[in-house]
A protein has these predicted regions:
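Terminal hydrophobic membrane-targeting helix
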Residues: 1-30
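Acidic helix-start/capping segments at beta-turn-to-alpha-helix junctions
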Residues: 1-7, 38-44, 66
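Short helix- or helix-capping micro-motifs
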Residues: 62-63
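Residue-level recognition of oxygen-bearing side chains
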Residues: 17, 42, 231
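Small/polar loops that bind or transfer phosphate-bearing groups
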Residues: 13, 38, 224
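Bacterial extracytoplasmic/cell-wall-associated proteins, especially those involved in peptidoglycan
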Residues: 31, 48-57, 66-249
Length: 249
């Protein structure tokens, strides 16, 4: 056959004839490789993950926080990292363009960017899928009420750019004044604190209807929610007791 030879990486069965090899090079399927970006992976770690893929080529900057849609992406050997990153960012833009017009009425955010910022907090605050809309509802209430969001991940982000802190948060860090710490500033941080997934964004665009304003860990990986500070303080006392029993305090 005089068909052109395709560029790419191919799988050749052992013992293939020269004719079969030529046919594979002309008409075969190029091997696709995969890279997965999990929900809540900050951009500094997205960058690390792409740079660690030996089959990709070229340099990329650390992407803007919140610009990458967590998912599994395929690529060919020798493809530019910049091309793969561009697909990840286009996927986020496409998802937001589709999701934003379907948002519920009277939500707490006024723009797509604000939705991504709040979704990044929801993403970092709960790993329990069934809680996402509840956590989004709670933070939406706090935004609307002009309350401090008091989200611990916003303390950590300026310190580590989203990498694990690896220790307890210090009192001085809780009191720090910067563009992200929601213990010392009313409203949303100046930007996202991670790359939120579809579910966290969807939760912010259609949060649970709840009167909850407070939450604390419940010892099972989830949270205990409360409408009043008094109720919340009881939940905090229970959490401290669980931690004492575990030898964490």
């Amino acid at each position: 056959s005089s068909d052109p030879i395709l560029a790419g990486e191919f799988l050749l069965p052992a013992g293939s004839s020269s004719a079969a090899i030529l046919d594979t090079f002309q008409h075969g399927e190029v091997i696709r490789r995969f890279v997965t970006i999990p929900e809540g992976l900050p951009s500094i770690l997205v960058h690390e993950r792409l740079m660690a893929e030996d089959h990709l080529t070229g340099e990329i900057p650390v992407p803007v926080e919140g610009s990458v849609l967590p998912d599994t992406y395929d690529f060919e050997r020798g493809e530019a990292r910049s091309a793969v990153l561009a697909r990840m960012q286009a996927a986020m833009q496409n998802y937001l363009a589709e999701a934003w017009p379907k948002r519920a009425e009277d939500i707490a955010v006024d723009s797509v960017q604000e939705a991504v910022i709040l979704a990044s907090i929801v993403e970092k605050e709960t790993g329990v899928a069934r809680e996402r809309r509840m956590v989004a509802g709670l933070y939406s209430n706090r935004v609307k009420d002009g309350m401090l969001l008091q989200a611990d991940p916003t303390i950590i982000y300026p310190l580590t750019k989203g990498k694990p802190l690896g220790r307890r948060i210090r009192q001085s860090e809780i009191a720090a004044i910067n563009d992200y710490n929601t213990y010392t500033m009313v409203g949303l941080p100046k930007g996202p604190i991670t790359n939120p997934g579809r579910e966290a964004i969807a939760a912010v665009l259609d949060p649970a209807e709840t009167s909850a304003r407070y939450m604390v860990a419940d010892g099972t990986g989830g949270h205990a929610f409360a409408e009043t500070l008094e109720e919340h303080n009881r939940n905090v006392a229970k959490w401290f007791e669980i931690r004492r029993q575990r030898g964490e305090m």
